[in-house]
């Protein structure tokens, strides 16, 4: 299934919680014109999109997002994703963000600003194919919950 949302006007949207959650047959999604600068909640936005193999989020403006929990969880076929333009300066919840990404081998989070994150629980749970994960720049001084962060990796 393909969905073209290139004409959606999302400039006033603040909450995208679960927007595509459980879209198991969704393979292609055109989000090229999605305006996300006012969004604060992206929790579970792509949760369970098991047929995704790639998704272009290069136009996503995440500077105001505070919740990215379970964002890509159970996107089992998604092998790679470019998050280099993600601004995570205000994010406080990254719980389960990549949980269940069984096909992914590498995640580059070198640009992630984690100084305000308090919850990283389940973040990389079941990332079974992950061969490289550099978290050397992660600032974890405010994190309160790291339970099950790397379980079944």
Language-model-detected regions and their locations in the chain:
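Negatively charged
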Residues: 1-153
């Amino acid at each position: 299934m393909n969905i073209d949302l290139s004409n959606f006007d999302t400039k006033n949207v603040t909450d995208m919680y679960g927007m595509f959650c459980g879209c198991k047959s969704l393979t292609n999604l055109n989000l090229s014109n999605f305006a996300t600068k006012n969004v604060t909640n992206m929790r579970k936005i792509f949760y369970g999109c098991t047929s995704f193999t790639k998704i272009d989020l290069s136009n996503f403006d995440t500077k105001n997002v505070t919740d990215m929990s379970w964002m890509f969880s159970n996107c089992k076929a998604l092998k790679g994703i470019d998050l280099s333009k993600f601004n995570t300066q205000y994010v406080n919840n990254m719980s389960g963000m990549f949980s269940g990404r069984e096909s992914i081998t590498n995640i580059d989070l070198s640009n992630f600003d984690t100084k305000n994150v308090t919850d990283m629980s389940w973040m990389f749970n079941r990332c079974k194919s992950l061969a490289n994960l550099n978290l050397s720049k992660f600032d974890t001084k405010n994190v309160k919950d790291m339970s099950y962060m790397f379980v079944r990796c």
